[in-house]
Amino acid sequence: MAEEGLNGTISGTIDQTQAYMDHLRADPRFADMVFKVDEEDEVSFAKMHVRHKHEIVRFGVEEVNVWKHSGKYLEPEEWLKVKDEPDTVVIDFRNEVEWEVGKFKNAVTLPITHFRDVPQHLGVLQQYKDKKILAYCTGGIRCEKATAFLIENGFKEVYHLHGGIIEYGKRTGGKDFDGKCYVFDNRITVDVNSVNPTVISRCEHCGKPSSRFINCANDECNKHFILCEDCGWETEGCCSDACRRHPDKRKYDGTGFYQKKGLQAVV
């Protein structure tokens, strides 16, 4: 929760999540809210968090006004039609770890670790100032701020993908999205493209195509990286020999996902 708006993600049974959506839509303020729904076999979150923050996603530029200057929405079907037009530039506003495993074909990417790093790359983006900008992110939240930032810095024609990558995959089959979509829950990556799917990321150990993220089994390292299943067992889920020899290395169970100590999922 922040002054600029709300953003939330929940996980539950079909009945539970439907009751949640019905309850929100019963409030006139949320009657037209669009929910992005993914079906999964397991609960995606281990614990509930409600936070009040200065920004929904930290950007660090105080004067950006998402209510006045956010880019125009492009519905997924429209995006598919115009993304390859001349003088059009597709820009990915996600972190490097996200676009490493999946991105739109020919998209401009930024070497950022956090969304708040975007303003540092304004100089690089200036070369596209007179182009038609098509911005995208996972679900559309970050693009509200990123497109407003571009417009406030003189970019004239700025659009962003309504509903983000996830909605694009549902409504268009995900055509021309290479790889998988990174998500910030226990799933880590999800399939998007059922039309012309590819794998663009590679195992850090052997170099074979893989989109399988794990955390290093050495708790002190905990590096988040791509490791194929075979190399996972060979390296015991570690990113280096030093981590594999570490006395406090966690037992690798084939998933590379380790719950925080003292945390228990409640279903």
Features from the language model and the residues they span:
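Rhodanese-like catalytic fold shared by cysteine-dependent sulfurtransferases
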Residues: 1-72, 95-132, 141-267
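Internal catalytic-core helix/loop-beta-alpha segment
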Residues: 69-85
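Structural scaffold elements adjacent to functional motifs in cytosolic proteins
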Residues: 90-92
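Aromatic-flanked redox-active Cys/Sec active sites in thiol-based oxidoreductases
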Residues: 138
